[in-house]
Amino acid sequence: MKHIISAYNFSRDELEDIFALTDKYSKNLNDTRKILSGKTISIAFFEPSTRTYLSFQKAIINLGGDVIGFSGEESTSVAKGENLADTIRMLNNYSDGIVMRHKYDGASRFASEISDIPVINAGDGKHEHPTQAVIDIYTINKHFNTIDGLVFALLGDLKYARTVNSLLRILTRFRPKLVYLISPQLLRARKEILDELNYPVKEVENPFEVINEVDVLYVTRIQKERFVDEMEYEKIKGSYIVSLDLANKMKKDSIILHPLPRVNEIDRKVDKTTKAKYFEQASYGVPVRMSILTKIYGE
């Protein structure tokens, strides 16, 4: 593996290797091999971040590497007008890899085409967030010991959420029984994404119609800024909150995931249920990203 730009960059075999590595790293985050010893990784975040930035930083340090970088472009030469290509060339001079987040779709792919060192996409616009998808499916596999045969429901903003695109794509490496796409018409998953998929999907608007069939409920935030009519947003927003009532209608062993941060799309009462796995999901950020870095640099 060199660049990680899309969820499609992972084969099933590679994902299963990452699952096994993550199991190991979860027990001991201090890897004795220190596969990044003597290496410097640049974390170049042109958008602010908390979890992704810090978990990559911690993963690199745990593997013996050094970290340089920034979160937010305000303090960089980008604020003075430097173009992305020049920034990437500069980072090639300073480091052995680039973990990059950018507001524009395709920015990570562009960077990989001019970079001599590995580029890892940590989120590019509304395009993809592939390492988050690996965290998602690792969490699912940890709970069910399989991905195959499960019924999924993705709920909320399915049009602009890059985590959704990566999850839909990474599921092509497995055999889900069915994926429900639950959203208002305005925020349905993009047709070009759905046309790529090799498993059955069904679009619905009311989560209560299908929630009793679901093994994995994946929730995303509905973005207020996409709506022209604020009253329409308020109406739709209230229809896509995971209430305790909705959670209680799910299967006994089902789980609820969220890539975080959340706003109000999951009722805080749901946090206390056994189905709420989103904080556990977030805790796997460091060991999963250690495993991905190991696949790139340690083999």
UniProtKB/Swiss-Prot annotation:
The entry's L-aspartate-binding residues are 80, 162, 221
Question: Gene that codes for this?
Answer: pyrB
What this protein catalyses is:
carbamoyl phosphate + L-aspartate = N-carbamoyl-L-aspartate + phosphate + H(+)
Tell me the organism's taxonomic lineage: Archaea, Thermoproteota, Thermoprotei, Sulfolobales, Sulfolobaceae
Judging by the UniProt lineage, the source's domain of life is Archaea
The protein's GO terms of the molecular function aspect are: amino acid binding; aspartate carbamoyltransferase activity
To which protein family does this belong? Belongs to the aspartate/ornithine carbamoyltransferase superfamily. ATCase family.
NCBIfam families named among the record's database cross-references: asp_carb_tr, PRK00856.1
* EC code: 2.1.3.2
Ordered alphabetically, the record's keywords are: Pyrimidine biosynthesis, Transferase
What name appears for this protein in its UniProt entry? Aspartate carbamoyltransferase catalytic subunit
Give the organism, scientific name.
Answer: Sulfolobus acidocaldarius (strain ATCC 33909 / DSM 639 / JCM 8929 / NBRC 15157 / NCIMB 11770)
Output one GO BP term: 'de novo' UMP biosynthetic process
Q: Which Pfam families match?
A: OTCace, OTCace_N
InterPro entries according to UniProt: Asp/Orn_carbamoyltranf_P-bd, Asp/Orn_carbamoylTrfase, Asp/Orn_carbamoylTrfase_sf, Asp_carbamoyltransf, Asp_carbamoyltransf_Asp/Orn-bd
User: What residue range is the signal peptide?
Assistant: none
